[in-house]
Amino acid sequence: MPVAKKYFEIRWHGRAGQGAKSASQMLAEAALEAGKYVQAFPEYGAERTGAPMRAFNRIGDEYIRVRSAVENPDVVVVIDETLLSPAIVEGLSEDGILLVNTVKDFEFVRKKTGFNGKICVVDATDIALQEIKRGIPNTPMLGALVRVTGIVPLEAIEKRIEKMFGKKFPQEVIDANKRALRRGYEEVKCSE
């Protein structure tokens, strides 16, 4: 008899330089501050900006013993729509969520991946360009993820942005990232 999973798993797909690793780390730190047990780690080969990469999260109420890559995620986050393929949704059950950074509709994503479960889309790149003035869509994607999962409160991510960016960047950069986070949260749309 299979043992019930005691933690929530997320697999991020993006390209190096798009912030998947940073987003998974920020999510983990926010969950840790909320009293959860967490894991966040990237997986990549010889990295160059633009090379495909993955990052992973596990978040739970109990100690997480497993140390392998996420094989059966509850959510797959795709930061770069050019990576969409059936391989992206490998291990994602029909009860899971596929969250994609795209301007395209649910049917486009469904055709590219063959996934018949819940699909959520948000134009995170445009949000990032408008708010942060850089085409790095990880912050709006994190806002969208928080909205569709409720894994941590949005305010917990805002606090992490303040802590992570507070000593390195001026207040206007922090505020721009918080706006991008909120817009991702507000603008994500889901099928079903």
From Swiss-Prot:
Primary gene name: porC
Pfam families (UniProt xref): POR (PF01558)
Protein name listed in UniProt: Pyruvate synthase subunit PorC
Subunit structure: Heterotetramer of one alpha, one beta, one delta and one gamma chain.
Keyword Metal-binding: no
Protein's UniProt keywords contain Oxidoreductase: yes
Catalysed conversion reaction: 2 oxidized [2Fe-2S]-[ferredoxin] + pyruvate + CoA = 2 reduced [2Fe-2S]-[ferredoxin] + acetyl-CoA + CO2 + H(+)
Keywords for this protein: Oxidoreductase
EC number: 1.2.7.1
UniProt xrefs under SUPFAM superfamilies: Pyruvate-ferredoxin oxidoreductase, PFOR, domain III (SSF53323)
InterPro entries the UniProt entry points to: Oxidoreductase_gamma_subunit (IPR051626), PorC_KorC (IPR011894), Pyruvate_synthase_PorC (IPR053412), Pyrv/ketoisovalerate_OxRed_cat (IPR019752), Pyrv_flavodox_OxRed_cen (IPR002869)
Entry GO MF terms: pyruvate synthase activity
